[in-house]
Amino acid sequence: MEDWMKTARVDTDRSYLATACWPYDRFPEMSQLMAGSQVVVLDAQGPGVVTNFHSSRMDILDEILFTKSAAEPDAYRRVLIEITYDHHEKPDISMPLSAFLADIDGACDQFRSIYFSKVAYSHNFRLPIPFKKHIKIVLKNPTDTDLISYTDVQWKKLSDLPADMGYLKIAYFDEELQIPEEVGHLCHIQGAGTVRAHWMNLGTDLDLAWNGEYICEGNQQYYIDGEEEPSIEYCGNEDAFSHSWGFGDCCGGDLHAVITRMEHPTPTRTEIAMLRCRTLDSIGFQKSLRLVLDYRYDFYAKDSTNPYHKQGVFASRKRVSYPLRVRNCIYYYSLECDKK
């Protein structure tokens, strides 16, 4: 629960709301997210902090207003978000909008958490995004399809930004690994920072993984400040996201950890996504952070030397090797922005 003194304190910071992409109300001159276009959602001088990013579901404009464009049914999955701090030449964050909102491929079920939520027709992103000098948030539509949507960004103008406030950064990983033999190096962040949220999406055609079995294994190892042995190691992907015994409670969870997706987009494909938000259990580091995904110690690894894997239910289960697409996103705060 939020501290009562923070809740009752009279706020002296000026609040603003920037709206975009919706010319069907008071602002007919507002730009839309048309095919091949981009829309500047926020262009603001600092110091300040974005406190909420809200975006409606992206729909094809043809189907709503009967305009003409070569519609791509999944165009909304390809919309990009770019966030640039302090007039940097290149964006500090650049990725698919749906991934930024923790709605991987736009295919997650409805969910809610303290930092992210997906409701019937919109998304909300509540990780604070502080900036010292300037911030620019842009949406890009690289497709041939006109899209209709509504977006708003709430932010505060601050008198000062404390020196220990970090910039929101993202470490994004997307590779296909041969499991269990191949190890995934999901991130290697340099400098000081704090992890506040992360999600993972696992996709495979392995029939044994239809309900999340096999892929729920895998050790997540956090190596902090160059150490040789990880300070934090979860013995199971589901446990790294505060669940246990696989993904039986699909698309359930609490406000800090949620299984957001268990989908079979084809007769053989399984896609599972998990989200975790960190408050008191944030992960801080002073020099570096490295995250490794390792399945080599699991019961179905052919080279396992664990004697328990030769007994009981473990001995009866099939040893396999299979391709696994791993997508992982870490949201962290960094003091290194000025060095870019």
Label every model-predicted segment:
Residues 1-340:
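Beta-strand-centric surfaces of beta-sandwich/beta-rich domains
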